[in-house]
Amino acid sequence: MFKKNDRSQSRTRRHMRVRKKIFGTAERPRLSVYRSEKHIYAQLIDDVEGKTLVAASSSEKGFDGVGSNKEGAKLVGKMVAEKALEKGLKKVVFDRGGFIYHGRIKELAEGAREAGLDF
């Protein structure tokens, strides 16, 4: 009998494969994205130090949108880009977190690019 793979296990395996190749530094941090049913989260991570440099999410107090749609994801992308530019970070490495690059993940990336991040 074949065992059916569940989506979360497949996503985790995809993410581990990608993480072998993607590495963030202080000069070029990793833009890590996580998508839940209700919210979307983005953070810039320095993997050398193991620290989060900048973070933004749709669950923050100042967020004026819905985190479970594309418009909200685009706002989160712009928020994380603005915070990064304030700290002098312009170049990043995009880590989609094992999620397929479409929908909310794509909108977050486009919002970050529009606000000035380079990846």
Swiss-Prot record:
InterPro entries: Ribosomal_uL18_bac-type, Ribosomal_uL18_bac/euk. Gene3D superfamilies: 3.30.420.100. CDD domains: Ribosomal_L18_L5e. GO terms for molecular function: 5S rRNA binding; structural constituent of ribosome. One of its GO terms (cellular component) is cytosolic large ribosomal subunit. GO terms for biological process: translation. Belongs to the universal ribosomal protein uL18 family. Part of the 50S ribosomal subunit; part of the 5S rRNA/L5/L18/L25 subcomplex. Contacts the 5S and 23S rRNAs. This is Large ribosomal subunit protein uL18. It comes from Clostridium botulinum (strain Hall / ATCC 3502 / NCTC 13319 / Type A). The lineage of its organism: Bacteria, Bacillati, Bacillota, Clostridia, Eubacteriales.
